[in-house]
């Protein structure tokens, strides 16, 4: 039969071993959780940026008119069909760290962003502006998705030629 002091000593030793193990494992678990959070944030930045880029490329590529004159720094005007089947002017623009689309009827739809105030995931125009075009060449789109609190960035840049420019719509073929 064991004495009460020995049982108490066994219990204290077990408690000490468990707490020593916890002290060794908790920093590792904390770093794992931090890495998971950084991965989740990076994935969200990439998803949002790729969605915005894909949407803009498709709309600019299918523009019904030449891109000349449509590029204005952080805004781009393009023509597309409306719900009634007529052509209307749409506009991409940046407002308060969000990419927005102004529809042909004047309504504005956000393409990025979740809130009306400051964004955790900010849409920032790249280099000098969001849209650039040199002498009738391709339209260059450049922007960054930025996470305010973690200081993470994902940069996006591509060029696209509208079909109207590529096929020289409105010009006489010889």
Model region roles, listed by residue range:
Residues 1-2, 173:
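Short, low-complexity, intrinsically disordered N-terminal peptides in bacterial proteins
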Residues 2, 6-61:
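Aliphatic-rich helix starts adjacent to a transmembrane/signal segment
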Residues 7, 112, 158:
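Ser/Thr-centric signal marking residues that sit
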Residues 50, 99-103, 163:
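Short, cationic motifs built from Arg/Lys/His that form the positively charged side of catalytic pockets
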Residues 66-136, 170-174:
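Type IV pilin-like appendage domain
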Residues 129-174:
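Short linear sequence signals and composition-biased patches located at protein termini or domain-edge surfaces
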